[in-house]
Amino acid sequence: MLFRSGEVADPAECKRIADLGIDFLAAGIGNIHGKYPENWAGLNFEVLGKINEATGDMPLVLHGGSGIPDEMIKEAISLGVAKINVNTECQLVFAEATRKYIEEGKDQQGKGYDPRKLLAPGFEAIKTCVKEKMELFGSINQA
């Protein structure tokens, strides 16, 4: 597989896949899904550059973008990454905001147990997270 946890793809294999006529390519460059361990080695920019060169500047996808340091994200974008998935980060901020709402007892006040109220802080936290990521990724006001 091309994007298993921490694996690094072969640029020649990426070229063969790109030559099939796909629109985007998600290739492993040391990225993983979920939370990154403290001893994570980071993204392999040398391989990313070779993949970008081999695939003719095809838009690349970075799975497991949550938790990758901003500078690494910027470097990946400069080397052809056009789409970055950050689902884990959104899930974590949603859970944290919802947990805070409940721990503060707001679900016990009035109709605070209404799912629309109970889940609203999590929804707002996701919106804030996505806006921050859009700014980091340079995708604000882009189609």
Task: Give the positions of each predicted feature.
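Active-site glycine-rich loop that binds ribose-phosphate moieties when present
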Residues: 5-17
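Extended, intrinsically disordered, low-complexity segments
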Residues: 102-143
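Active-site-adjacent beta->alpha loops and helix N-cap segments on the catalytic face
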Residues: 34-52, 69-73, 92-101
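Structural preference for beta-strand elements that scaffold enzyme active sites
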Residues: 23-26, 59-61, 83
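Glycine-rich phosphate-binding active-site loops on the catalytic face of alpha/beta enzymes
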Residues: 29-36, 79-97
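Short, small-residue-biased leader/transition segments that mark boundaries at the very start
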Residues: 1-2
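Alpha-helix-loop-beta-strand connector modules within alpha/beta enzyme cores
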Residues: 8, 19-20, 40-62
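Catalytic cores of alpha/beta
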Residues: 60, 65-81
